[in-house]
Amino acid sequence: MTSENHTTIKADSALVMSPTGSTSQAAPFSPSTSKPIQELPDELIQAGWSKCWSKRENRPYYFNRFTNQSLWEMPVLGQHDVISDPLGLNAAPASGEANADAGLGNGQRKRHPSEDASQAGPNSFKRPKVEIPATPTTPTVPISPSTPGVKPWVNTTTDEKQGQASTPAPAPYRPSVVYWDLDIQTNAVIRERAPADHLPPHPEIELQRAQLTTKLRQHYHELCSQREGIEPPRESFNRWLLERKVVDKGLDPLLPSECDPVISPSMFREIMNDIPIRLSRIKYKEEARKLLFKYAEAAKKMIDSRNATPESRKVVKWNVEDTMNWLRRDHSASKEDYMDRLEHLRKQCGPHVASVAKDSVEGICSKIYHISAEYVRRIRQAHLTLLKECNISVDGTESAEVQDRLVYCYPVRLSIPAPPQTRVELHFENDIACLRFKGEMVKVSRGHFNKLELLYRYSCIDDPRFEKFLSRVWCLIKRYQVMFGSGVNEGSGLQGSLPVPVFEALNKQFGVTFECFASPLNCYFKQFCSAFPDIDGFFGSRGPFLSFSPASGSFEANPPFCEELMDAMVTHFEDLLGRSSEPLSFIIFVPEWRDPPTPALTRMEASRFRRHQMTVPAFEHEYRSGSQHICKREEIYYKAIHGTAVIFLQNNAGFAKWEPTTERIQELLAAYKVSGRSLPSPGPSSTNTGEKDSKPAPERTAPSQDNSSPVDKTAQDTTNT
């Protein structure tokens, strides 16, 4: 039980806010803390038991500080220790009935095998049934913690359990390093909203989506190779997915299908930047000479093989010939001379080369989009068929009544009930949890698997017995794996996040409790926005940030480094700040790109809501890798090779409440100086368990007037330097 405060006084407050629109007058209602607390017998106190009061449930519960066990009913004297004596062989029951129920948690009725067989699904976590009302005002936190010693992720049948009865239950897994703090409650307030109409996730559909997305990546690779003779720009497909989702009105959570315009500016720009060849970073003089020669040769070949105007052919051929002559006669040139000559050649030939490649590149973008739309149609049809076979109607779903009131933010709820889930197998390989469905395996560290279990217990309201937990974890990991690709370190920058000490400083100094761009895998707080509401909502997501409209709260934003997404983010910030009179604050972390500056950075610097701005120098701070849920511990932190601009956007009330004073800024900068790789155990020390804001890729989509690759501008940020 890692997120409960075991005290007779401290507890959680209710979620309901007064609909008056004022957070100062709308303090959440909470029951009195002056409830008389019944004294426990000395025997129970000596055994580690104490009686605590739950404000959430408005009733007492009992907590054992030695075993971390929590019970609603008073512990029975002589009850056995479920950890040291899981079978109750040494117990001293008070009655025959108690003896018959030995091995069960206190207050739990022994279940018959027939009941277990009928109620336990293929992905069942054997947990005591917990009733959680599905109202948005109910705190999305577990009513009762799991019983120590019980491993809910063990998928076994009743017969298997009986055959293994002689094996003691293993001790609960406790990660040695924690990169999150799930105890922090939100201060983000929103208007109550109806459940979303997304189709509920299912492993069969997720597997089909993964296969078609991989096939789409292959189509993209083939088109770039066949039509332009280049490799697809690194991460360009990933940024295409991000950019398309800014404008997409389609129904699939991952693939775009209804976008205007059809031609993606992001994909078009990145392919054009690698034509006629991809320019790489140069360290030595000979490399610069070879690169200049290759560029001149490729430009001449392209202009000869395409339908170019006579003027374009003349300009390109003359400049290429002039460059070749210079290379033949000048053997004493330095690296800088070669690079200057290359820049001159690009300025002269670039516009003509781009004009002959324009139609072909637009054709690539258009074809990829239309293939994606066809794949979306197939996936949707298969999903609807599956739901129909389970007698689940999509069109007949009644919309829930929503009151016009302010509430603390709560996870996305789905209006369509989930179908029965197919079996997902789980096993552990050292510190790695491996989940397999139809031969497709996904992996996650045991620490992050434990974190997903906690998030699921806090957020999910339709699966109190954890019967769908494993299948939803498989879908979640598979979705992010497919979105960011299977290459080495591919997409990890798009999922990176701030160091733990920085999150701690943001929370302590500026009241930050919410991440605008994160995922269940890399979030620090248990409340965050993410890309996929249909699956992430079960793990605490409040949905995509561009459709999330808080009335008040303090937020951290570290968006994926996609220019179109960052620009849309700034528009959303200014709209929210302009509409709300309640305290509202956004602290934004974006790359310090000045050659040229990104539109998002320029707009934020000129915003009327900008209260403060600072820069953290390159190589003097770190990020956490987006693959932190699976990579080695020593690879989690990496140095940033670019500066990071930190901008405070606040309305008047937010500035008054969370003003970026000199002292607070100094504390934030000091947190950046703490190396994550030197921390013995990052994260809150008070918890035993517990990853974007989505820290996007330390890569930038290069502007159209620059023919260098995005990778060349920023290199690979996932290596420790």
UniProtKB/Swiss-Prot annotation:
Outcome, altering F561A: Strongly reduced methyltransferase activity
Outcome of swapping W593A: Abolished methyltransferase activity
Biological-process GO terms, alphabetical: methylation; mRNA processing; positive regulation of translation
Domain of life (superkingdom): Eukaryota
Localisation: Nucleus
One Gene Ontology MF term: S-adenosyl-L-methionine binding
Gene3D superfamilies: 1.20.1270.10, 2.20.70.10
Notes on activation and inhibition: Cap-specific adenosine methyltransferase activity is inhibited by zinc.
Broad enzyme group: transferase
Keyword Transferase: yes
Residues annotated to bind substrate: R239, R269, E563, W593, R594, D595, P596, P597
Keyword Methyltransferase attributed: yes
Entry keywords, A to Z: Methyltransferase, Nucleus, Transferase
Compositionally biased residues, Polar residues: 1-10, 19-36, 702-721
Predominant location category: nucleus
WW domain span: 43-77
Pfam families reported for this sequence: PCIF1_WW (PF12237), WW (PF00397)
Catalysed reactions, semicolon-separated: a 5'-end (N(7)-methyl 5'-triphosphoguanosine)-(2'-O-methyladenosine) in mRNA + S-adenosyl-L-methionine = a 5'-end (N(7)-methyl 5'-triphosphoguanosine)-(N(6),2'-O-dimethyladenosine) in mRNA + S-adenosyl-L-homocysteine + H(+)
Binding site for S-adenosyl-L-methionine: N558, P559, P560, F561, F619, E620, H621
GO CC annotation, single: nucleus
Record protein name field: mRNA (2'-O-methyladenosine-N(6)-)-methyltransferase
Source species: Danio rerio (Zebrafish)
Lineage start: Eukaryota, Metazoa, Chordata, Craniata, Vertebrata
Encoding gene (name): pcif1
